[in-house]
Amino acid sequence: MNTFSLQTRLYSGQGSLAVLKRFTNKHIWIICDGFLAHSPLLDTLRNALPADNRISVFSEITPDPTIHTVVQGIAQMQALQPQVVIGFGGGSAMDAAKAIVWFSQQSGINIETCVAIPTTSGTGSEVTSACVISDPDKGIKYPLFNNALYPDMAILDPELVVSVPPQITANTGMDVLTHALEAWVSPRASDFTDALAEKAAKLVFQYLPTAVEKGDCVATRGKMHNASTLAGMAFSQAGLGLNHAIAHQLGGQFHLPHGLANALLLTTVIRFNAGVPRAAKRYARLAKACGFCPAEANDIAAINALIQQIELLKQRCVLPSLAVALKEGRSDFSARIPAMVQAALADVTLRTNPRPANAEAIRELLEELL
């Protein structure tokens, strides 16, 4: 039996920050990173809130938020006792906000509303029951899943993402595509998640290159913002897979941007998963739905067409190879493979991969990357 639950009220479109005017005479705690704390975007957020609110800011969030940061946030939340918490930023800020609120609730600290406002189009964290917390000492990322992690509200205002640099736009956009593809072939996929994942994938293929090349186009940014949320809805229900299980290790060990790590793995993982008939047919079906091959094409031809389009998309987005992305870390890559293999096997996202992957398979995939 499959279940499908959307617990976040979504507000989208240009000017949707205006919904924040509903909060009056509240203590509002904004969680963001240090860059956003000194960015005009924070002023935009402040100006969207009525003047009678008390506003506090926690700006200690770093890429791949750490256990230490979450503990620090819980302590500050206990001291401040806010009524509204706003996770403002990319996936790291939203993940940290969700984790801080969740763990605080378990300690008896409750709030009225948790709001997620993305300033990148990638993680879909604004509508998911997931967050990822890192342990830098061990070089491991821990994905957490719990229905209590759903934000109460999400605001998708494309005006907040027009200033995102091309490389970040590319990386986060490829994260969206990975979410959609992994949800699409998941054993827990359903008609409901298929609709979300297919639409998200189509939007990425159509709009990501323009978002990278002409980032000031609000309409294009809005399409990618929507794609991110659609894919987030899909994987929150259907799960992820091997791509994320390995990407978490590339990020934890080498601090690669998460979306880039996913992009570098994507076609390799597709070839691996296509080794089982169900996944092969699913990939082929998506390729045909996207118009990448004739309807009468066999599965192999359709999968090759999908892979070709992904590689072309990566080229349009000017994504580096793994060797280039690793920089000086390349010399340590082979030595770290055993640790990455074990951590990937323990990663919760592996549970919904369409093809079982043992240690040898993951090792071979990692070796193939270089």
Swiss-Prot record:
Alphabetical list of PANTHER family matching this protein: ALCOHOL DEHYDROGENASE, HYDROXYACID-OXOACID TRANSHYDROGENASE, MITOCHONDRIAL
Consequence of gene loss (knockout): Loss of NADH-dependent reduction of propionaldehyde in BMCs. BMCs appear to be normal, cells grow more slowly on 1,2-PD with limiting or saturating CN-B12.
Top-level EC class as recorded in UniProt: oxidoreductase
Family membership noted in the UniProt record: Belongs to the iron-containing alcohol dehydrogenase family.
Gene3D superfamilies the record matches: 3.40.50.1970, Dehydroquinate synthase-like - alpha domain
Cofactor dependency: Fe cation
pH dependence statement: Optimum pH is 7.0 for propionaldehyde reduction and 9.0 for 1-propanol dehydrogenase.
GO MF annotation list: alcohol dehydrogenase (NAD+) activity; iron ion binding
Induction field: BMC production is induced by growth on 1,2-PD vitamin B12 medium.
Cellular compartments annotated: Bacterial microcompartment
Keywords for this protein: Bacterial microcompartment, Iron, NAD, Oxidoreductase
Domain of life according to the entry: Bacteria
Chief subcellular location: other
GO cellular-component term (any): propanediol degradation polyhedral organelle
Protein's name in the database: 1-propanol dehydrogenase PduQ
Activity-regulation annotation: Enzyme is oxygen sensitive.
EC number: 1.1.-.-
UniProt GO BP: propanediol catabolic process
Complex formation: Interacts with PduP, probably via the N-terminus of PduQ.
Gene: pduQ
Pfam families, per the entry: ADH_Fe_C, Fe-ADH
Record-linked InterPro entries: ADH_Fe/GldA (IPR001670), ADH_Fe_C (IPR056798), ADH_Fe_CS (IPR018211), Alcohol_dehydrogenase_Fe (IPR039697)
Annotated metabolic or biological route of this protein: Polyol metabolism; 1,2-propanediol degradation
Record field: catalytic activity: 1-propanol + NAD(+) = propanal + NADH + H(+)
Biological role stated in the UniProt entry: An iron-dependent alcohol dehydrogenase required for optimal 1,2-propanediol (1,2-PD) degradation. NAD(+) and NADH are regenerated internally within the bacterial microcompartment (BMC) dedicated to 1,2-PD degradation by the PduP and PduQ enzymes, which reduce NAD(+) and oxidize NADH respectively, although there must also be cofactor transport across the BMC. The 1,2-PD-specific bacterial microcompartment (BMC) concentrates low levels of 1,2-PD catabolic enzymes, concentrates volatile reaction intermediates thus enhancing pathway flux and keeps the level of toxic, mutagenic propionaldehyde low.
